[in-house]
From Swiss-Prot:
The gene is ATL49. Pathway: Protein modification; protein ubiquitination. GO terms for cellular component: membrane. GO terms for molecular function: transferase activity; zinc ion binding. It is found in: Membrane. It comes from Arabidopsis thaliana (Mouse-ear cress). This is Putative RING-H2 finger protein ATL49. It catalyses: S-ubiquitinyl-[E2 ubiquitin-conjugating enzyme]-L-cysteine + [acceptor protein]-L-lysine = [E2 ubiquitin-conjugating enzyme]-L-cysteine + N(6)-ubiquitinyl-[acceptor protein]-L-lysine. A zinc finger (RING-type) spans 126-168. The chain crosses the membrane at residues 43-63.
């Protein structure tokens, strides 16, 4: 025990003699003092000036965007003078293009490929489907840029685009509301009937020219046959044949230039009909080259209406009218709400096609320059009286949206179909 006690005392003396650990200095006060020393009034002044500049530039941008934008007339003038490159840039930036209305597509002229004046032996190509034009193919012409395409190809394209697929020129600028009011010519091909058929709507008399008067506008439709008019009065129509220029081209390989290129072109054009009327252009680089030397034209018949037949309002198109089996409904709506363009044939059923062909066979023969064909079906006076008496008893078919709402609400409404008399 005597030995252990002095050893414990010695260890305590050693522990007490060791220096204490150093204290950690506080850096918070030093960092704040450093920031205060670094931020000077000059830096604060620069930050304030930059923020004011950005604020003023944003206000100027808003003023330029909303207050200094060009008017509608200047926009139309700009689109009329737009170039091909500007049209391509516009198509790239305006990806929300909803296309052209079907009624506007139906007004574009249609012609046969064989009716082109100045056509050479070598066939031209369609830039949309990459197929060669054949003699019996129907082409639709864009009068603004004079480019022609297959009817099915260009109709499908224009339903989702409002520009030419080749030069990207805007079609809507040439068919604005102001242009429609000032234009009094209707382009109809001389050797081709229109792609739209008229529903058999006639009055009790035997005249084919009639007026349809509405509260908002009046539309006058005249046929082009003098023998159908008992008085022979055709003062409202003046026919002129105007040749229109047609620009066509063909695909050529730009990788092989020389003597072998002509042979390859001929082999491509000769073997193009082997694969479902289409060619494979995935190998190599091809360009659609226009034939600048060839002067291709199509003779088009124009009809000029007199001053009393011109309507100072928007022209009623075929696809904007409804159809009612009664006589009063016929006077209000001249045609069915359907477009008879070739691009929408697949939407109609077989029965409807058979009805259209039978009605077409019974129509009276018009001249080929007439843009609208009126089937010669008369409405008997007895049937007209029956339809007038039964008009109050007939209930119109509700719309699809209303039927859907009734179905969702759980209602069961009886829909009475109007009985149409077969003429």
């Amino acid at each position: 025990m005597n030995k252990i006690l002095p050893e414990m005392k010695s260890t305590q003396n050693l522990i007490s003699s060791s220096p204490p650990p150093p204290l950690i200095p506080l850096k918070s006060n030093t960092s704040l003092s450093n920031l205060n020393s670094k931020i000077t009034p000059n830096i604060l002044l620069i930050i304030i000036i930059l923020s004011i500049i950005f604020f003023i530039s944003g206000l100027l941008h808003i003023l330029v965007k909303f207050l200094l934008t060009p008017s509608r007339e200047s926009r139309e003038d700009y689109f009329d003078n737009v170039t091909a490159l500007q049209g391509q840039l516009q198509q790239l930036f305006n990806l929300h293009d909803s296309g052209v209305d079907q009624s506007l597509i139906d007004t574009l002229p249609v012609f046969h490929y064989k009716s082109i004046v100045g056509l050479k032996i070598s066939p031209f190509d369609c830039p949309v489907c990459l197929c060669e034009f054949e003699t019996e193919d129907k082409l639709r012409l864009l009068p603004k840029c004079s480019h022609a395409f297959h009817v099915e190809c260009i109709d499908t394209w224009l339903l989702s685009h409002s520009t030419c697929p080749l030069c990207r020129s805007n079609l809507l600028s040439g068919f604005s509301s102001h242009h429609n009011l000032s234009s009094s010519y209707l382009l109809v091909l001389e050797s081709e009937q229109s792609s739209r058929d008229m529903v058999p709507v006639l009055e009790s008399n035997s005249q084919l020219g009639y007026d349809v008067n509405n509260d908002s506008e009046s539309t006058r439709i005249r046929s082009g046959r003098k023998s159908c008019d008992p008085d022979g009065d055709m003062d409202g129509l003046d026919e002129k044949v105007v040749p229109l220029e047609v620009k066509l081209g063909k695909f050529r390989n730009i990788d092989h230039v020389g003597e072998g290129s002509d042979q390859k072109k001929n082999s491509i054009s000769g073997n193009s009909k082997n694969v479902d009327g289409r060619r494979c252009l995935s190998m190599g680089s091809y360009e659609y080259i226009m034939d600048q030397e060839a002067t291709l034209k199509v003779h088009v018949s124009t009809k000029k209406l007199s001053g009393k037949d011109r309507v100072p309002s928007h022209r009623t198109v075929m696809s904007e009218c409804g159809f009612d089996p009664t006589v009063k409904g016929i006077e209000k709506s001249v045609v069915e709400r359907e477009s008879f363009s070739l691009s929408k044939i697949w939407l109609r059923g077989k029965k409807e096609k058979q009805k259209g062909t039978s009605a077409r066979d019974s129509d009276c023969s018009f001249v080929s320059s007439s843009s609208l064909r009126f089937p010669n079906h008369r409405i008997p006076p007895e049937e007209s009286l029956k339809s007038e008496n039964s008009e109050s008893l007939e209930t119109k078919t509700p719309s699809f949206a209303r039927r859907t709402m009734h179905w969702l609400a759980g209602r069961q409404n009886k829909i009475v179909q109007p009985s149409t008399s077969n003429v």
